[in-house]
Curated annotation (Swiss-Prot):
Coiled coil: none annotated. Mg(2+) binds at residues 8, 58. Its cofactor is Mg(2+). GO terms for molecular function: holo-[acyl-carrier-protein] synthase activity; magnesium ion binding. HAMAP family: AcpS. It comes from Lactobacillus johnsonii (strain CNCM I-12250 / La1 / NCC 533). It holds the Pfam family ACPS. The keyword Lipid metabolism applies. It is found in: Cytoplasm. Transfers the 4'-phosphopantetheine moiety from coenzyme A to a Ser of acyl-carrier-protein. It catalyses: apo-[ACP] + CoA = holo-[ACP] + adenosine 3',5'-bisphosphate + H(+). Keywords: Cytoplasm, Fatty acid biosynthesis, Fatty acid metabolism, Lipid biosynthesis, Lipid metabolism, Magnesium, Metal-binding, Transferase. One of its GO terms (cellular component) is cytoplasm. This is Holo-[acyl-carrier-protein] synthase.
Length: 119
């Protein structure tokens, strides 16, 4: 049964300015494993990665119906690449199936997260 669907978007230019300021925002938003992947990237790909992970976490919290804050925090949600480069999302706050989707162009990063409860 579908528990929730969350959608979010982030402007690439906004995220580029954040990345240019240093790693403070990235360290707050990304889990240690995500940050490790992030540090391996450069330029545009680094901006897309941070913006994508931020947006996916926003989408997840919207699908949960809580938003980010008291119940769900950035460190409770992790999205890593599988062997084929697909995003695989896990969370300490949800035990069902999580289906993340991410797309981006030169201007916008858009994410969708579908949560499926297991019976």
């Amino acid at each position: 049964m579908i528990r929730g669907v969350g959608i979010d978007s982030v402007e690439v230019e906004r995220m580029k300015k954040i990345v240019e300021k240093g790693d403070k925002f990235a360290k707050r938003v990304l889990t240690p494993k995500e940050f490790e992947q992030y540090q391996q990237l450069k330029g545009k790909r680094k901006v897309e990665y941070l913006g994508g992970r931020f947006s996916l976490k926003e989408s997840f919290s919207k699908a949960m119906g809580t938003g980010l804050g008291k119940y769900v925090g950035f460190q409770d949600i992790e999205t890593l690449w599988d062997d084929l480069g697909h995003p695989v999302m896990t969370s300490t706050k949800f035990s069902g199936n999580i289906f993340p989707s991410i797309t981006h162009d030169d201007h916008e990063i858009i994410t969708v997260v579908v949560l499926e409860e297991l019976n």
